[in-house]
Amino acid sequence: TLHLVLRLRGGHCQVPCGIFDDPKLVSDIMEAIATIRKAMVQIGELSATLNALNINQMTRWVNTKEEHATKIVSLVSEYCLCQRVKPSADPKSPFKSEADYIAALGSHHNVMLAAVKCKQTVDPANADALESAAKEMGKMYMPA
């Protein structure tokens, strides 16, 4: 059911401009996840030796991790949920039932929750969970 392809008219920039590139959206999210994972690994490695340089580099990696997790939350909330996911009663909705719509909301919410968890931790397992959630959600945005 979550394998729906969202094909709606509207705009990702809230104008609406009618320009969508859903595969690029999925690619951007996956790239952000790869960056988050790398940041987590780097923070772990740098924390083995605490000196001024490593503390500086860890701070930069923490900031990078935060920025990319925030980017994911923004993409999902502002692009996906505000522009692409429409209630099943909406004539532009890709969902055939309320249950499909609710499942899609849950899938998107799981990505946002996992992204926030990545902000809170440096455990690469959380990046893996984010990637898994994003792949599931991403099925809705890839060509059939």
Label each residue range with its predicted role.
Residues 25-32, 58-61, 65-68, 72, ...:
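Amphipathic alpha-helix face/heptad-repeat signature
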Residues 75-98:
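Short, solvent-exposed, charged loop/turn and helix-capping segments
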Residues 34, 38-41, 67-70, 109, ...:
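Solvent-exposed, polar/charged alpha-helical surfaces in well-ordered, non-transmembrane soluble domains
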Residues 97-144:
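Helix-rich interaction surfaces within compact, conserved domain-sized segments
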Residues 6-53:
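Immediate post-signal-peptide N-terminus of mature secreted/exported proteins
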Residues 15-22, 48-62, 93-101, 120-131:
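Alpha-helical rod/repeat scaffolding segments in eukaryotic adaptors/tethers
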Residues 36, 40-79, 83:
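Alpha-helical segments in soluble extracytoplasmic regions
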